[in-house]
């Protein structure tokens, strides 16, 4: 069993509906963790979710309490511009520096793709020059790095049998991803076309990975989310990243 912390994958929404002469507003809150949570439960792991809006109040987190830290669909500004800094101009610890130190001293870390991951929509995720950029096995664009594929794509596996795959043989269909470039010393386990989908490496005393597509809709198609390959992949990633059972 591994202890997993996922930061991100949450959002508020506010809508205006116009019906003829009349209009009204409504809002809500959603999370996008159900598919990962189910996969990790199947693997017997302990899963903790820190929603994006709670980073400002719940950090600092004791990262050593976790075997694997994941960031998904949460931009750099969420970690850097907390009320202490942005509103009151106070100094505080940098969560991204803490994550970088964590992985270099033996922790496991990964970033999952999305509109506010890697470069992100309009470049707003802004991780290209962040404190965690050098811990990831990919080079991140400072610009909008999204590749939208409404027609879908079926990823190819470069290294069949790699422990991070967990035995998965199909990794799609996918409807989009963040375009990344693999670092020289990294292993590209799977690709979307010519672009890395799953990239892994050892960094310092720890391990890190980059998964360029989303862990839920819309980039991950419903048929893939419901497949046994989806759960196999994510449990394989946990096994590889945390070094469970002697994985390579």
Model-inferred region functions:
Residues 1-2, 12-19, 33, 104, ...:
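An acidic, glycine-rich "communication" segment
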Residues 32-35, 75-78, 137-141, 160-163, ...:
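Short, surface-exposed, polar/charged, turn-prone segments marking secondary-structure boundaries
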Residues 5, 21-122:
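Helical hinge/lid and interdomain linker segments adjacent to catalytic or ligand-binding clefts
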Residues 33, 92, 96, 125-132, ...:
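Amphipathic alpha-helical segments in well-structured domains
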Residues 22-25, 84-87, 117, 127, ...:
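Generic alpha-helical propensity signal that fires on short helical segments
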Residues 38, 42, 101, 134, ...:
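Charged/polar, solvent-exposed surface patches and flexible loops
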Residues 43, 143, 240-244:
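Solvent-exposed amphipathic alpha-helical surface segments
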Residues 1-20, 52, 56, 65-69, ...:
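A glycine-centered loop/beta-turn motif at secondary-structure junctions
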